[in-house]
C-alpha cells in the first residue's frame, strides 16, 4: 500500500526520533523532503542532512540537534494535507509564535520559510510549522 502523505510521515519520524533521543533519522527521500530538510538546516533546527543511494532507492538521513539535552524542535506539525490543502497569499502567511518559530511554505520560487516568502512577495502552500 502506498503512503498517502509522505511529508506527514517525515515530520512524524523526526518528532518520534527526537522524543527517543536518536542522533539521526532515516527515511525515503524525495526532492520536496530534501528541500524541507534544507530549510530546517538553514533555520538551525537540524544539524545536517544527506541524500544517498541505497539499493537503488534514495535515502534521506537527517542528523538531529539537541540543546542542553533537549530537542531543538519543540513542535513540528503538518498544516496542509492531501485532504485539505492550505494556500495563503504573501500577506496572509502565518506568524508562528510571534516569529520564534517558522512556517515552511512551498512557493513558485521553491520551498522557503514564511519570512522569506513574505520578503519575496510570494504566497503558496503552507506545508508545516516548526517551533
From Swiss-Prot:
One of its GO terms (cellular component) is ribosome. It comes from the Bacteria. PROSITE patterns: RIBOSOMAL_S8 (PS00053). The keyword Plastid does not apply. One of its GO terms (molecular function) is structural constituent of ribosome. Part of the 30S ribosomal subunit. Contacts proteins S5 and S12. InterPro entries: Ribosomal_uS8, Ribosomal_uS8_CS, Ribosomal_uS8_sf. The gene is rpsH. This is Small ribosomal subunit protein uS8. The keyword Chaperone does not apply. One of the primary rRNA binding proteins, it binds directly to 16S rRNA central domain where it helps coordinate assembly of the platform of the 30S subunit.
Amino acid at each position: 500500500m502506498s503512503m498517502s502523505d509522505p511529508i506527514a510521515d517525515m515530520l512524524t519520524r523526526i518528532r518520534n526520533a527526537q522524543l527517543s533521543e536518536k542522533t539521526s533519522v532515516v527515511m525515503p527521500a524525495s526532492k520536496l523532503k530534501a528541500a524541507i530538510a534544507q530549510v530546517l538546516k538553514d533555520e538551525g533546527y537540524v544539524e545536517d542532512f544527506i541524500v544517498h543511494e541505497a539499493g537503488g532507492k534514495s535515502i534521506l538521513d537527517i542528523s538531529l540537534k539537541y540543546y542542553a539535552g533537549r530537542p531543538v524542535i519543540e513542535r513540528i506539525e503538518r498544516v496542509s494535507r492531501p485532504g485539505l490543502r492550505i494556500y495563503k497569499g504573501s500577506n496572509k502567511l502565518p506568524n508562528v509564535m510571534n516569529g520564534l518559530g517558522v512556517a515552511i511554505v512551498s512557493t513558485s520560487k521553491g520551498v522557503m520559510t514564511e519570512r522569506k516568502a513574505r520578503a519575496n512577495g510570494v504566497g503558496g502552500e503552507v506545508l508545516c510549522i516548526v517551533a
